[in-house]
A protein has these predicted regions:
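Loop-helix junctions at membrane interfaces
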Residues: 14-26, 30-33, 38-253
Length: 253
């Protein structure tokens, strides 16, 4: 339990707090409740409204936190359902874990989308561990955010189907560019260092599926870019058809 302290409200009195960061909020509620009680009518209702206003100002309600956890858990499960694509090396596998992340980001906001993405990675790490020295998980987090956050920010500016489509197209393009950059300059060198293999070996895996791949740049353009484009399109289509039904369910809870 947190240490109980006393915080002075704006009126002459003290209110008990569990911990200091919420002192001003509880003091505000205390003062508003006293004022409501002094009127003699509607005091309880005004006190409830005061609590709701101050809770909403914190940004994360209990309902929102519950949905963030739920979407993160579903996304982590979907990470186990993965399959390779014929034009990418075997260590690139497509999964649908970004679907609940994107739906959650549309419904709850881009910040919530980031936390759903983070929970997805952490839960998956706890359950399965890492086979890539954490590099694959970091890549999933960064590139996933590159897809979800632009889409959610655009949709948040005007919640229409048109905005959703524009957001998902933008997110797909940003993810594709970010994926190429990250793989060419960060992830592939990190893989090579972590597993003690030359870059030529990794590039050779790309050459095995596409003869035009002969260096890191062509690997990124001919293997990574198509992979992320396909992933963005598939996730966007599924989200487009599911979102309305799931958002209605969220609002009804």
């Amino acid at each position: 339990m947190g240490k109980t302290v006393l915080a002075r409200s704006r009126k002459e009195g003290y209110v008990p707090l569990l911990y200091p960061p919420y002192g001003s909020i509880l003091a505000d509620v205390h003062d508003q409740a006293l004022s409501a009680a002094e009127t003699g009518r509607g005091g309880i209702k005004k006190m409830e409204n005061a609590i709701k206003r101050n809770m909403s100002s914190e940004g994360f309600t209990a309902k929102k936190l519950a949905f963030i956890g739920l979407f993160g858990a579903v996304a982590s499960v979907l990470m186990f359902l993965e399959f390779p694509l014929p034009f990418a090396p075997g260590f690139y596998k497509l999964d649908l874990s970004e679907v609940p992340v994107l739906i959650g980001a549309f419904a709850l906001g881009p910040v919530s989308g980031f936390f759903i993405e983070l929970i997805k990675i952490l839960v998956h790490l706890v359950i399965k561990g890492t086979q890539t020295a954490g590099i694959g998980e970091l890549a999933n987090l960064v590139i996933g955010c590159a897809f979800v956050l632009p889409a959610a920010l655009i949709y948040r500016a005007g919640k229409t189907r048109k905005r959703a489509v524009i957001g998902m197209i933008t997110g797909t393009l940003v993810m594709t560019v970010a994926g190429c950059f990250m793989n060419a300059f960060v992830l592939l060198p990190a893989y090579a260092t972590a597993f003690g293999m030359p870059m030529e070996t990794l590039v050779g895996m790309g050459t095995a599926v596409n003869k035009a791949v002969h260096d890191v740049l062509t690997f990124a353009v001919l293997c990574v870019a198509p992979f992320n484009l396909v992933k963005g399109i598939v996730v966007s289509l599924i989200t487009f058809f599911l979102y309305k039904h799931i958002s209605t369910l969220i609002k009804s809870v």
